[in-house]
Amino acid sequence: MEIVNKQSFQEVLEYVRMYRLKNRIKRDMEDNNRKIRDNQKRILLLDNLNQYIRDDMTIAEVRGIIESMRDDYESRVDDYTIRNAELSKQRREASTKMKEQKKAHAELLKNAEK
């Protein structure tokens, strides 16, 4: 019985660890979503700004700078999207492990009662 309790305690610790990991991943994904949204707003801002700037109003290099900034923001959006996909995969894996562990623990308790 003591072996079952020790194993059960270890499983509970592992379950808590997985639950915390899952929550951390969820927070990271929400943070990435905010970053994606912010950078998409910046892209829109730069697009609008680019419509108002005329060659006779300012130096042509300004357009190059704006385009460079826009490309940078688009790259960031892509990077965050990829990171979100990776985090989502980790979260699904953690959920699967937690379900398996919960099922195994239930079976262990069921067998211990016999």
From Swiss-Prot:
Coiled-coil blocks: 70-111
Keyword Cell inner membrane: no
Record Pfam families: DUF496 (PF04363)
Subcellular location: Cytoplasm
Region spans: Disordered: 89-114
GO CC annotation, single: cytosol
Keyword annotations of the record: Coiled coil, Cytoplasm
InterPro entries membership: DUF496
Function in brief: Pole-localizer protein involved in the regulation of several cellular processes.
Similarity comment: family membership: Belongs to the pole-localizer TmaR family.
Protein's UniProt name: Pole-localizer protein TmaR
Organism: Haemophilus influenzae (strain 86-028NP)
